[in-house]
């Protein structure tokens, strides 16, 4: 679980990177569909799934909106992300293993966009936080 120090580190990092959330989401989702092409199956209803397309940008923005929500609900991710968990489990039917894949892409993008802020301590705390988000999103699958 997240310590108070982890929570503080995530909040501090988010305060610096939050205004770039749309760009982070676009880049992370674009990387995911290139590096893990099997994830394209969830977006087969889109006319264009190429990196940086309008649909990728819009969904990247939506994903990062979910991350922003998670930051605001950091003290109780399970309850705070309950609606998103239900949506991903029952409506979208996303394999929860993909949350880990996208988390990795988000970490890569943040590390390249914000190298000075992405300290080893920030990396560990953000990784733990994103793992907690993935676990909370997978809650309704049980």
Swiss-Prot record:
Upper classification of the organism: Eukaryota, Metazoa, Chordata, Craniata, Vertebrata
Family membership noted in the UniProt record: Belongs to the globin family.
CDD domains linked: Hb-alpha-like
Gene: hba1
InterPro entries noted in UniProt: Globin, Globin-like_sf, Globin/Proto, Hemoglobin_a-typ, Hemoglobin_oxygen_transport, Hemoglobin_pi
GO cellular component, one term: hemoglobin complex
Native organism: Notothenia angustata
Function statement: Involved in oxygen transport from gills to the various peripheral tissues.
Keyword Heme: yes
Pfam families membership: Globin
Name of the protein: Hemoglobin subunit alpha-1
Binding site for heme b: 88
């Amino acid at each position: 679980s997240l310590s108070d120090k982890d929570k503080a580190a995530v909040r501090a990092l988010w305060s610096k990177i939050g205004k770039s959330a749309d760009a982070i989401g676009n880049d992370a989702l674009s990387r995911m569909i290139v590096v893990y092409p099997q994830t394209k199956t969830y977006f087969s209803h889109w006319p264009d799934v190429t990196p940086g397309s309008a649909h990728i940008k819009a969904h990247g923005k939506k994903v990062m909106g979910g991350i922003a929500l998670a930051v605001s609900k950091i003290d109780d991710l399970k309850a705070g992300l309950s609606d998103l968990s239900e949506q991903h489990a029952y409506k979208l039917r996303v394999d929860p293993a993909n949350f880990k894949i996208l988390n990795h892409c988000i970490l890569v993008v943040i590390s390249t966009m914000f190298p000075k802020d992405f300290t080893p301590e920030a990396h560990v705390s953000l990784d733990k936080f994103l793992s907690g988000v993935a676990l909370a999103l997978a809650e309704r699958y049980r």
